[in-house]
A protein has these predicted regions:
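Glycine-rich phosphate-binding active-site loops on the catalytic face of alpha/beta enzymes
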Residues: 85-90, 163-168, 221-237
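Conserved anion-binding
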Residues: 70, 85-153, 165-168
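N-terminal amphipathic alpha-helix/helix-capping segment at the start of soluble metabolic enzymes
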Residues: 1-10, 122-128, 190
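Catalytic cores of alpha/beta
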Residues: 70-81, 93, 145-151, 208-218
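Active-site-adjacent beta->alpha loops and helix N-cap segments on the catalytic face
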Residues: 38-52, 68-71, 89-102, 115-122, ...
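Conserved, mostly hydrophobic/aromatic
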Residues: 11, 35, 83, 97, ...
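Conserved N-terminal beta1-alpha1 strand-loop-helix module at the mouth
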Residues: 1-60, 66-67, 155
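Conserved small/polar residues in nucleotide/adenosyl-binding loops
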Residues: 246-252
């Protein structure tokens, strides 16, 4: 997914539905991330969503709700090819995250891939360590003080910026698509600079296609645009706004 030099366009699944996952998987995304942190999705929802996504060429990822080995291992066994891990603040936490994603001797992931043996074949364990994408989220005040030690941790493939929590961490209001006049924007560029220095991928969550394009032009390798829930809401609102009954007048001869 991230070997051809092109930026990855990532979709975001917050709706606990195979129908939504299927619709998203057929829209041309390079990858889809199932959000198990802030979305409405739990494991029982995520498993059939992963099965649905696996009928396409889209790479399935998941954002776990915490840097907790059991949850990371279980969702990997369910069919994820990458983990977005929130709130990674220092090297020790980065090491714990990486090791939960990798089989010995590189980590302590327990062997029991279940679906992996179906879609990855009997040699799944031989190549899983190299194929699983590991993105550590930079979004805490402490992480901003430890960028190089996090990014230089062996096995960390890249970082992922959560602009909302990052903004809160530095005393600004939460939100996506930070203006260039904000401190959060300056920190985003500083994080990107450190990622490039450490030769790892840099990802960021965006609210609009315009901002995602801007971030690609700045050098980000991995951009997420909104989510299925936001797209549904925006599409529905645009439809209603276009044909708003509050602006229509019935003909005088219309039967009541």
């Amino acid at each position: 997914m991230m070997k051809d030099g092109k930026p990855v366009i990532n979709g975001w699944c917050a709706i606990p539905s195979t129908a939504s996952a299927e619709a998203m998987a057929h829209q041309g995304w390079d990858s889809l991330t199932i959000d198990m942190q802030h979305g409405l999705v739990d494991y029982s929802n995520a498993l059939p969503m992963l099965q649905t996504i696996s009928t396409t060429d889209v790479t399935p990822l998941a954002r776990v709700n915490w840097n907790e080995p059991g949850q990371i291992m279980k969702i990997l066994d369910a069919g994820c090819y990458g983990i977005v891990c929130p709130m990674v603040s220092n090297r020790k936490e980065a090491e714990n995250f990486v090791q939960a994603c990798m089989y010995p001797p590189d980590g302590y992931r327990s062997f029991g891939p279940v679906r992996g043996l179906i879609y990855g074949g009997p040699d799944y364990a031989d190549h899983a360590n190299e194929e699983i994408l590991k993105l550590a989220m930079i979004e805490t005040k402490e992480s901003l003080e430890n960028l190089d030690e996090i990014m230089s941790t062996p096995g960390v493939d890249g970082i992922y910026i959560g602009p909302a929590d990052l903004s809160l961490a530095i005393g600004e209001k939460p939100g996506f698509d930070r203006a260039e006049t904000t401190k959060a924007y300056s920190e985003i560029l500083r994080i990107l600079e450190h990622a490039k220095k450490n030769n790892i991928f840099a990802g960021i969550h965006n609210g609009t296609t315009e901002y995602a394009t801007k971030m690609i032009e700045k050098g980000f390798d991995f951009v997420t645009i909104a989510s299925d829930l936001r797209a549904l809401s925006a599409g529905a609102k645009a439809t209603v706004d276009t044909v708003s009954y509050t602006h229509l007048t019935l003909p005088t001869n219309h039967p009541v």
